[in-house]
């Protein structure tokens, strides 16, 4: 199933889980209301999917569409530039959501090898972006060769190390977000004081 090399595990996305496609059979009239789905931009812009940035699509009760689950790794599948193909993100929410048609997902089932929250950082690494770049094929429009990517070998830290790394990076992210909020407050306070000077 996988091979251990010292402090690393050699595996592949095909061994870590099962892949699925995004929405299919939809027209422009189906969008705007209904069930939440993850947009291309949400995947492209965030290493963890933002749950306050869903859009909506009409889906019937008996309609067969793939559902995104907690821990799924999502990738952009198609773009006009190769740099935008294969950009990854991870869904860490619990709401039942769907995925746009220009992305695909991998449902991580082998949680003895991969810690999904850690993968949100892993797929954002510069080294991983360089690794995935050759799988973007095309001329005027580029598509990710999904089958080859799934079979390609990747190296992960041990599960224990993944959890430790995620914990450290998660705390740093929280610190950055706190600092960002404080900066916004200071800027608001500055603007208020400047306005008071000229009343």
Predicted ranges, named:
Residues 1-13, 181-199:
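Short amphipathic coiled-coil heptad-repeat segments
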Residues 1-3, 165-176, 195-198:
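Hydrophobic structural patches
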Residues 24-27, 96-103, 129, 136-160:
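A short glycine-rich beta-alpha junction/loop motif
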Residues 26, 49-53, 176-188:
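Short, tandemly repeated low-complexity microdomains enriched for cysteine and small residues
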């Amino acid at each position: 199933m996988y091979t251990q090399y010292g402090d690393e595990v050699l595996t592949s996305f095909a061994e870590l889980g099962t892949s699925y496609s995004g929405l299919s059979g939809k027209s422009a009239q189906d969008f705007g209301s209904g069930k939440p789905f993850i947009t291309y931009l949400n995947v492209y812009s965030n290493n963890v999917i933002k749950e306050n940035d869903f859009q909506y699509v009409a889906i019937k009760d008996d309609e067969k569409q793939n559902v995104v689950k907690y821990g799924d790794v999502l990738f952009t599948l198609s773009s006009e530039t190769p740099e935008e193909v294969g950009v990854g993100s991870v869904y860490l929410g619990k709401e039942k959501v769907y995925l746009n048609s220009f992305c695909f997902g991998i449902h991580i089932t082998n949680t003895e090898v991969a810690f999904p929250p850690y993968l949100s950082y892993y797929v954002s690494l510069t080294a991983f972006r360089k690794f995935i770049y050759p799988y973007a094929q095309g001329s005027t429009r580029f598509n990710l060769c999904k089958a080859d990517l799934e079979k390609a070998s990747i190296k992960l830290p041990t599960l224990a190390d993944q959890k430790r790394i995620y914990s450290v990076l998660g705390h740093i992210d929280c610190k950055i977000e706190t600092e960002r909020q404080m900066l916004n407050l200071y800027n608001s306070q500055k603007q208020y004081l400047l306005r008071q000077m000229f009343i």
